[in-house]
């Protein structure tokens, strides 16, 4: 009794499993002439498989007992260059090109039990060729490969379904696999359009414009450095100033601006490619069309425009740039900060001097149109840094010098004045042995008929002889001249000697004018130039001067007063202050001093002063309240108006009224102090006091001339000149020649215990070269250049 339920259950299971197979009709062998008959492996009988309709849910698992089909893949032949397999449609069916041979690869299980397979579009499993085991290109239990082609589908037959039959059945039947992943269609689905074509063309044009904008701004804005924009703001035109002012705040966000433009450019270029794929189609045509549009309209044209018009284009697109910076701020700000950390922030670097010089030379023709004077000056000032004294000095062979034995007669003074020099070196025996300097102004009050010796005059004034090395930079020499102590220096070089200490040999002379010539790149004919060009040594072409003997002939010198007024003026001045007495200034020198410094103001010069508020001419202003003055003035005739005090009380000063007696007192005290010093230092100290404005006063009144007036104006320098001239006249026969033993040089003093080669550091020091050292160091004597001139003068006399 216990076995009855189990037997009943087994019977029910067998009936259930075999009932579908027995219910399907068996196809006869009448259709054995079809495309391919079914080959039964276990028997020689050829049977046509019948069709078993599949159910809706997993037919392969319900109706195929052993075979399981998991999916399929379609492949084109390796030799085929055409794209045959087009992918999947929305139904997940594989899309292929119709009537093209493809390889169908099936994946699953128990494929060794497949008896036949085919594809059907109408559900009959007879509309395409059947494939048996012998027709398989490759077969494994999990993989089967067949080669076939699919005809073009119609609207009613839109896809091909897989039909599979198993072996080892008396009545083999096809089972249709309803899985959409195993279905094949030759109907090419329409391309999904993002938008209508007319709207796509409009968007394409807009994206191309933005691509060009990003590309152009990337080149135009990033090449405009903040330094260059500041130059436009400072020195550009009004339009350039406005444009640069708008761009500068945006341009300072260097890395953030760069990231914004690059990201925007990449995004719009990708959008152009997608729209081209929709409008033109896929394949090589899209590649050519997208590349051509991006390169031509997005790169070449905008960058060519922004290279030349970067400033105006960048200024007019600032609103768009600001919007893009705002929209992309969350993305670009972190990237820009990372770039700032690793690459540092963008620095505003100016051009180095050497690069600036080369840039000016390269842009000479294109910008300035040739070497104009302004261009030469700028270039000369920049090149001054690399030049030394040797580049600008006048060689010693071309220097106008005087021998120390020369006698200054009337004819010789005339010749010296005819040369046009104001500072003349004096040499002793050898032209390389310069011992003193003579200023032509020192001869102003001397009588040429007294035949003074040039060395005696130079010893009285004792002008310092400055010496520098030949390799001294011109910029340092210019700084020395700018201090105002001297504007001329001798140039020496170090000469090595065997078994002896090195010596310093004269090789030229440098003046402030020579440095200015190097700056302005133009030759200036000064008192040291015997040649017109220091480089090419071109001789000066002098114009014939007028008769200079009238300068030294005082008998016919013009004066603002007559002889009677001159005599009275001499008498008044000699008694008004001790500085005008014969103890300081000789009467003959005083006469020349008064003649030289008398001035007359005509009434016609004040015809314009009738109007109120007119500025007075310079000759009419004698003293200004609060301004330093170093002159003494005596009214000889006429009247001057003096304004005194806060109330501006006005007084008139008539004839023989004097102003500036403080200058006379200070000068007398300075002379008395100098008498207590050595002869070589007395004149130097007086010159130093006058140069430093130590002799003078600050008036607390204003003095102007409103009417016709004659007055005598004598400065502290005139008083010193008159005093020195008087000393020369008094000691003409007794004076002992004092050579310059205070020749100041920029060469360091060499210690006796030092090595033979002197060592110099960067500091500028002064040293005193004694006469004995000079005579010992300098070479042999040279002939006097003025011997022939003296003989010629003696013959004329």
Curated annotation (Swiss-Prot):
Signal peptide: 1-23
Residue intervals of the CBS domain: 393-454, 461-527
GO CC field: basolateral plasma membrane; plasma membrane
The keyword ATP-binding appears for this protein: no
Extracellular side: 24-200, 277-280, 344-797
Alphabetized UniProt keyword annotations: CBS domain, Cell membrane, Glycoprotein, Ion transport, Membrane, Repeat, Signal, Transmembrane, Transmembrane helix, Transport
Entry-listed glycosylation sites: 31, 42, 676, 692, 724, 731, 761
Domain CNNM transmembrane: 193-373
GO MF terms, alphabetically ordered: transmembrane transporter activity
Name of protein: Metal transporter cnnm-3
Species name: Caenorhabditis elegans
């Amino acid at each position: 009794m216990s076995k009855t339920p189990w037997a009943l259950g087994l019977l029910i299971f067998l009936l259930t499993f075999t009932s579908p197979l027995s219910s399907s009709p068996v196809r006869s062998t009448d259709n054995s002439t079809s495309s391919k008959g079914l080959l039964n492996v276990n028997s020689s009988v050829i049977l046509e498989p019948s069709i078993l309709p599949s159910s809706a849910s997993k037919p392969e698992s319900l109706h195929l007992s052993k075979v399981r089909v998991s999916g399929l893949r379609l492949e084109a032949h390796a030799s085929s260059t055409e794209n045959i397999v087009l992918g999947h449609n929305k139904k997940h069916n594989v899309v292929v090109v119709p009537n093209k041979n493809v390889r169908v690869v099936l994946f699953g299980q128990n494929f060794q039990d497949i008896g036949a397979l085919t594809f059907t579009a109408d559900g009959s499993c007879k509309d395409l060729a059947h494939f048996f085991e012998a027709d398989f290109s490759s077969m494994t239990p999990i993989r089967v490969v067949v080669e076939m082609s699919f005809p073009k589908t119609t609207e009613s037959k839109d896809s091909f379904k897989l039909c599979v039959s198993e072996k080892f059945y008396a009545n083999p039947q096809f089972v249709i696999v309803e899985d959409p992943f195993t279905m094949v269609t030759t109907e090419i689905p329409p391309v999904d359009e993002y938008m209508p074509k007319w709207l796509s063309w409009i968007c394409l044009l807009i994206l191309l414009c933005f691509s060009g904008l990003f590309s152009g701004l990337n080149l135009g804005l990033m090449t405009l450095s903040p330094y260059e924009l500041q130059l436009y703001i400072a020195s550009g035109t009004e339009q350039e100033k406005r444009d640069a002012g708008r761009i500068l705040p945006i341009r300072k966000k260097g890395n953030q601006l760069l990231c914004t433009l690059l990201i925007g450019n990449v995004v719009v270029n990708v959008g152009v490619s997608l729209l081209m794929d929709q409008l033109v189609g896929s394949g090589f045509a899209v590649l050519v069309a997208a590349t051509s549009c991006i390169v031509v309209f997005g790169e070449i044209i905008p960058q060519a425009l922004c290279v030349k018009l970067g400033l105006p284009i960048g200024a007019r697109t600032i609103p768009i740039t600001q919007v893009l910076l705002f929209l992309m701020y969350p993305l670009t700000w972190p990237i820009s900060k990372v770039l700032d950390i690793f690459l540092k922030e963008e620095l505003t670097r100016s051009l180095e001097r050497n690069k600036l010089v080369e840039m000016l030379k390269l842009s000479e023709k294109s910008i300035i149109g040739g070497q104009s004077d302004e261009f030469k000056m700028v270039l000369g000032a920049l090149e001054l840094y690399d030049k030394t004294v040797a580049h600008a000095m006048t060689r010693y062979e071309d220097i106008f010098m005087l021998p120390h034995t020369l006698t200054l007669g009337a004819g010789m003074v005339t010749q010296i004045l005819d040369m046009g020099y104001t500072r003349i070196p004096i040499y002793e025996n050898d032209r390389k042995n310069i011992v003193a300097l003579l200023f032509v102004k020192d001869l102003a009050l001397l009588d040429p008929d007294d035949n003074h010796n040039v060395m005696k005059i130079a010893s009285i004034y004792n002008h310092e002889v400055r010496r520098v090395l030949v390799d001294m930079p011109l910029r340092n020499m210019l700084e020395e001249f700018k201090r105002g102590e001297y504007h001329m220096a001798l140039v020496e070089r170090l000469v090595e000697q065997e078994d002896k200490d090195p010596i310093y040999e004269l090789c030229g002379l440098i003046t402030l004018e020579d440095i200015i010539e190097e700056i302005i790149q133009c030759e200036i004919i000064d008192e040291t130039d015997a040649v017109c060009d220091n480089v090419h040594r071109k001789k000066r072409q002098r114009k014939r001067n007028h008769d200079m003997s009238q300068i030294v002939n005082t008998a016919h010198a013009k004066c603002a007063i007559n002889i009677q007024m001159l005599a009275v003026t001499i008498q008044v001045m000699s008694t008004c202050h001790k500085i005008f007495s014969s103890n300081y200034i000789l009467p003959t020198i005083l006469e020349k001093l008064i003649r030289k410094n008398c001035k007359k103001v005509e009434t016609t010069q004040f015809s314009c002063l009738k109007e109120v508020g007119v500025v007075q001419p310079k000759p009419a202003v004698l003293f200004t309240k609060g301004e330093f003055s170093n002159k003494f003035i005596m009214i000889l005739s006429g009247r001057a108006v003096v304004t005194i005090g806060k109330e501006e009380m006005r007084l008139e000063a008539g004839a023989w009224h004097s102003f500036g007696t403080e200058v006379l007192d200070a000068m007398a005290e300075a002379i008395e102090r100098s008498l207590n010093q050595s002869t070589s230092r007395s004149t130097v100290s007086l010159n130093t006091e006058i140069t430093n404005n130590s002799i003078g006063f600050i008036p607390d009144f204003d003095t102007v001339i409103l009417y016709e007036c004659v007055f005598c104006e004598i400065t502290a320098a005139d008083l010193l000149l008159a005093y020195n001239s008087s000393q020369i006249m008094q000691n003409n026969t007794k004076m002992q020649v004092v050579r310059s033993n205070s020749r100041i040089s920029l060469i360091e003093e060499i210690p006796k215990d030092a090595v033979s080669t002197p060592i110099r550091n960067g500091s500028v020091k002064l040293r005193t070269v004694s006469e004995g050292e000079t005579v010992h160091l300098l070479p042999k004597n040279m002939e006097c250049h003025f011997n022939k001139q003296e003989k010629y003068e003696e013959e004329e006399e």
